[in-house]
Amino acid sequence: MLVIPAIDLKDGRCVRLRQGDMAAETVYSDDVPAVARQWQQGGATLIHVVDLNGAVDGEPRNFPQIEAIIRTVTVKVQVGGGIRSIETVRRYLGAGVTRLVLGTSALADRSFLEKACLEFPRQILLGLDARDGKVAVKGWTALSETKATDLLKELAGYALGAVIYTDIARDGMLGGPNLAALREVVELSSFPVIASGGISQVEDLRAVQSLGPRVEGAIVGKALYDGKLDYRAALAALGAE
């Protein structure tokens, strides 16, 4: 199972938010490429990057920083946040991004999701962000009436690469993942699942890994930046190193 470090970008800097609240940020670094380099040197094979401004505004806002990450590291980079058009998809993949995460657009514009999956099969991931079982959209600033489980069923035939499941209530809180919800997603999903939100210790990673081989990885952010979780130790514990 992959342990995937997260780089969340806001106003050109690496930050972390509490439960997706744009006003509750902690700035970790102004040197975004250096952060990416640090994770590559630590053993990461995939880095998860989120354009937080883009997620709210609906279009890329930190593209220069993401380009700088691509130029700096040789490992795979997946990007989410503000990807609402096929032109944006082509722009990112053309710049060297490996995979893209679609969230709001998967719910709001199914024809766009279809087109992206047809043009770039398995390079499009579903960002399934949920609070109390309902899908959140627009950078988590709005809650839809759609159940996360229903959306999974609807998208079963799409050429998605994976599903990233985030429990918003757990994100940035270091309280452990929502294993019950995650288990339901793993059982329902036709695609590999990546867990996100709340992971703070090796035991959390082992619990996620125990959900079976369909769990591709776990995204970790705050715990790494706050020093609560040592990245190399996490890799070693999961036998990933």
Label every PLM stretch briefly.
Residues 2-6, 46, 74-78, 98-101, ...:
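Structural preference for beta-strand elements that scaffold enzyme active sites
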Residues 8, 39, 47, 79, ...:
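Conserved, mostly hydrophobic/aromatic
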Residues 12-15, 19-24, 90-93, 97-171:
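Conserved anion-binding
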Residues 46-64, 104, 165-175:
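Glycine-rich, proline-tolerant flexible connector loops at the mouths of alpha/beta enzymes
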Residues 53, 58-118:
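Glycine/small-residue-rich loop that forms an oxyanion/phosphate-binding "nest" at active or ligand-binding sites
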Residues 70-99, 180-215, 234:
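Catalytic cores of alpha/beta
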